Amino acid sequence: MIKYKYIKTISAALISAMLITGCSADNSGSTVNDSSHGVLAGSTDTSAAAGKNTDGDSSDNSTNESSGSASNSSSSATTVSSATSIDTSDMFTNRDKEIGYDESTSVKLTLNGDSISSSSSSVAISGSTATISEEGIYIISGTLDDGMIIIDADKNAKIQLVLDNASINSSTSAAIYVCNADKVFITLAAGSENTLSNGGEYIAIDDNNIDAVIFSKDDLTLNGSGILTINAGTGHGIVSKDDLVITGGTYNITAASHGLSANDSIGIADGSFTIVSGKDGIHAENSDDEALGFAYIAGGDFDITAQGDGISAGYYLMIDNGSYNITTKGTGSDDSAKGLKAAGNLIVNDGTFTISTTDDGLHSNSDMSINGGSFTIATGDDGLHADNDLIINSGVIDITDCYEGLEGLNITVNDGTININASDDGINAAGGTDSSGFGGFGHDAFSADSDVNIYINGGTITINADGDGIDSNGNLYVTGGGIYVSGPESSADGALDYNGEATITGGTLIAAGASGMAENFGSDSTQGS
């Protein structure tokens, strides 16, 4: 039986503390684990056919799968079902990354205020509108006060637009409109500064509803090393109704709606992004196919201020690296204002994240895996929330302000450093529906009849909670790690709270909290003090 002792000098309220030390575990915070439960990795979900490669070349990217070794020697802990990551092997093609062009053989378009000039027969000019109809490379420079560039070519055509100090404003439509092509590449010329804008109105063209400064019905890639500033007083910044890929460049986007938006997928290899949006900063969603609408970010620098979500995916969201400063400001009960959000799995392998949100910091309607990275999170709701499995394999997570720190149906901590300052529970494995969440496809919802578990196999966890320190509406299993809980002074809460069984077979746990709801581990525990 585990022994514990009371401490009455922590505060004016009666406070209890449990000191449970490891006899057989490595208390350094890492754990060797021979169990597969809790690792969001392994097999590849081929239904997420990331990045349809139609460029006629092979991708030079290897498949990225989230990984993270995990171990657990506890025979009491049941296995948490694993999930899969995105196959990104053909997300970025060689052509996506190709920014070179031969100026001597390229077609030149010169913007002259209220007119456009070009000597090529593949460019039809009508007033201040130029329509490109053939495959090739087109260099655009100059200023167009009120007009647009239209791509209307063969369905197999690949067209490269080079913006070389180009400024285009359209008062009634997109500055660049891709009506028909196989794929269009927009290259920001080295050293160039380009500006695209809309004057506040979008008029349909041939029954096509256009609602972005750059609007593409087909695959769209942006690359290069120049600067692109987009101002969308109405509608979105950049939209692709197919795949949107960005492999380089500097982007300053101000949009009334989404900053970047795509139906099938968004893939970002690199770039610098400053986005101020009336809705989501980056948004991928496909209402017709649940296996589309995913987002993958390999790296880049992101500064996002959004009234909606910072980065939102209607299917999977996977981040391999990058620097992220995300602020969301939504306040409506029917709106979603999360930092990172996925309707499917949310996977973070590395990166630096500073997230300040009125809604959840990170949210998944399915499974979430944190395999690395550094996080500083201040939120009005949950720090990290998953409707199914929340798995932390590595990383430094500092949740400075939140309602609940970690929340999921099943929570597994295999390693990492986690600091939580919560106004309610520090860690909560929940059943039923949590009404604290905002709207969108991000309401907090759990299956009421599902098994609920918390597994702590390693890492260092420090919790300061006004509610329960660790609360499982099912079972609690501790096999390793260092856990330090400063629980509530309220007699209605406790440092530990569970509804099923609780066992400890390794690690160190020090818990302080009000004695009115104090609970201890069960007799099946092999740990003593």
Descriptions of predicted regions:
Residues 2-529:
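A composition-driven surface/loop motif
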